[in-house]
Each structure stands twice: as structure tokens, then as C-alpha cells.
């Protein structure tokens, strides 16, 4: 699996791995790259079955497989210890990595994540699946911003959204791959295992997230032994895109604090 690695800003700089959500594209994290590159070696990638890592996914494709193939690719690149920043599905992959490779994951940042899918989130995906089946890729892509962004943010950026729609449609991961990745997301359940995650965790959520209620992050915070929760008042599900200044400040402070906390505990 192809990875994109930034040059380390200094010798032995900590590594931060960015894992996007259901869309799977590493470019999702573009608003974070410039600030992270100054302090960390950053790893981005298109998830298997998407972008520049095309593949046909098995029907039983799982979050555990997503975690294993990423860890194997990191080890092959010479990276054995790393922090993880995951958004939604990416946060699930991050938790799986922390469970399966505890010696490798130094810190976990969960952005609008959850322990197991909330009934509201499931309802949103049911609607989106119906759109996919009835209207194809174009209907899925055109509806997606409604679940990602605040209404006023979208209204002020209509040309940008049109361009994003065209790009997303041109690089659509395919109906079968999308549904198999979505099914993996829906099956994931960390409610009985989260207390085994021992690395420090930063939880970031947005209070106006239409797709994932903030209660999901509260449940995560209660279940994870060493976690802290930060709530953004604005930004929607893709708060790192819509309000990168606020998000980046939270992320940079959290990573620095938790990595120091981790090293002090060793």
C-alpha cells in the first residue's frame, strides 16, 4: 500500500499518521499538513480500495484489516512507533491499531469518532445508501456535503463545493468498495474493548456535527482510561476543514501534551 511521507523536520522527529474517514482520501487532511510538517514527520495515504491504492475489497472487509494493512505498510517504510489522528472511520482504525499494536501507537486522536455506531448515524447512512442505490455515485457525492459541513459554510462556498463534487465523482471509489467499507464501519464495536487502550487519547468533536452526535465522544471519553475531550462549538462533521484554525490549535496542543505525557510515563 502506497504511503505519502513528509521529510522529518529534525532527526528522530515523532511520526503522526493521518487516517481519513469513509471517503478514504489522504487529501482530506490538507488543512493540517502545513502546521504538522513543522513539528512531525507526517504520513498520509489513500485507504485500500480508494485513490492511488485501488483494489477490490472482500465482502467481509473489516476495520481490523484496515488497521493491519496500514501497520504493515508503516513497518515496511521503517516506521515502528507513531501517533494516530483519525477522523470518524479513521478513528475506529486508530482504536484498532492501539488495541492490536500497543507498542507502536504512542498517542491517539479521535475526531468525531464513536465506540459503536449511534442510531442517528445509522439512520443517516441508511438515507445515503438509498440515494446511492437509486441515484448512483452522483447522488451520493452531491448529498455528502450536507452531512459534513455547516449550512452557512456551504452557502458561502458554492463554487468550491461544485468543484469538490466534480473531483469526488471523478475519483469515486466504486459502489461495491464503498458499501464494503461502510459495512465494516457499521459492524465495528469497541464498547467492550476500549478500556484496554492504554495510550493517551485526545477526543475532538464538534457540537454541530449533523452525522455523529457529540454524545458519541462523551461515551468514548468515559470508556477510555487515559483520555481528554475537547468540544468545538462550530465546524460540523468535517470541523478540521471548516475551522482549521481552531482545530489545528487543539490538535497541536494535544499532540505535544500527550506525547510528552507518554514519554514521561516510560
From Swiss-Prot:
UniProt-listed InterPro entries: AB_hydrolase_1, AB_hydrolase_fold, AB_hydrolase_sf, Pyrimidine_utilisation_RutD
MF (Gene Ontology): hydrolase activity, acting on carbon-nitrogen (but not peptide) bonds, in linear amides
Reactions catalysed: carbamate + 2 H(+) = NH4(+) + CO2
Single GO BP term: nitrogen utilization
Domain of life: Bacteria
Pfam name, any one: Abhydrolase_1
Signal peptide: none
Gene Ontology CC: one annotated term: membrane
Keyword annotations: Hydrolase
EC category name: hydrolase
Documented EC number(s): 3.5.1.-
Keyword Ribonucleoprotein: no
Function statement: Involved in pyrimidine catabolism. May facilitate the hydrolysis of carbamate, a reaction that can also occur spontaneously.
Family according to the record: Belongs to the AB hydrolase superfamily. Hydrolase RutD family.
Name of the protein: Putative carbamate hydrolase RutD
Gene assigned in the entry: rutD
Amino acid at each position: 500500500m502506497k504511503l505519502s511521507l513528509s521529510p522529518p523536520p529534525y532527526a528522530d522527529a515523532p511520526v503522526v499518521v493521518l487516517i481519513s474517514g469513509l471517503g478514504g482520501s489522504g487529501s482530506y487532511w490538507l488543512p493540517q499538513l502545513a502546521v504538522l510538517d513543522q513539528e512531525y514527520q507526517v504520513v498520509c495515504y489513500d485507504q485500500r480500495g480508494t485513490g492511488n491504492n485501488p483494489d477490490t475489497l472482500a465482502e467481509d472487509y473489516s476495520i481490523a484489516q484496515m488497521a493491519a494493512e496500514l501497520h504493515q505498510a508503516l513497518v515496511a517504510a521503517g516506521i515502528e512507533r507513531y501517533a494516530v489522528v483519525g477522523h470518524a472511520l479513521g478513528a475506529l482504525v486508530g482504536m484498532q491499531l492501539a488495541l492490536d499494536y500497543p507498542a507502536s501507537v504512542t498517542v491517539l486522536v479521535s475526531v468525531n469518532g464513536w465506540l459503536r455506531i449511534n442510531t442517528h448515524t445509522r439512520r443517516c447512512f441508511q438515507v445515503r445508501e438509498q440515494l446511492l442505490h437509486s441515484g448512483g455515485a452522483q447522488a451520493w457525492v452531491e448529498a455528502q456535503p450536507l452531512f459534513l459541513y455547516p449550512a452557512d459554510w456551504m452557502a458561502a462556498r458554492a463554487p468550491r463545493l461544485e468543484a469538490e463534487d466534480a473531483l469526488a465523482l471523478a475519483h469515486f471509489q466504486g459502489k461495491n468498495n464503498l458499501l464494503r467499507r461502510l459495512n465494516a464501519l457499521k459492524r465495528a464495536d469497541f464498547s467492550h474493548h476500549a478500556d484496554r487502550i492504554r495510550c493517551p487519547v485526545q477526543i475532538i468533536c464538534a457540537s454541530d456535527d449533523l452525522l455523529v452526535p457529540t454524545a458519541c465522544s462523551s461515551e468514548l471519553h468515559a470508556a477510555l482510561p487515559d483520555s481528554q475531550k475537547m468540544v468545538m462549538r462550530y465546524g460540523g462533521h468535517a470541523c478540521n476543514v471548516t475551522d482549521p484554525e481552531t482545530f489545528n490549535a487543539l490538535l497541536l496542543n494535544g499532540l505535544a501534551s500527550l506525547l510528552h505525557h507518554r514519554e514521561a510515563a516510560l
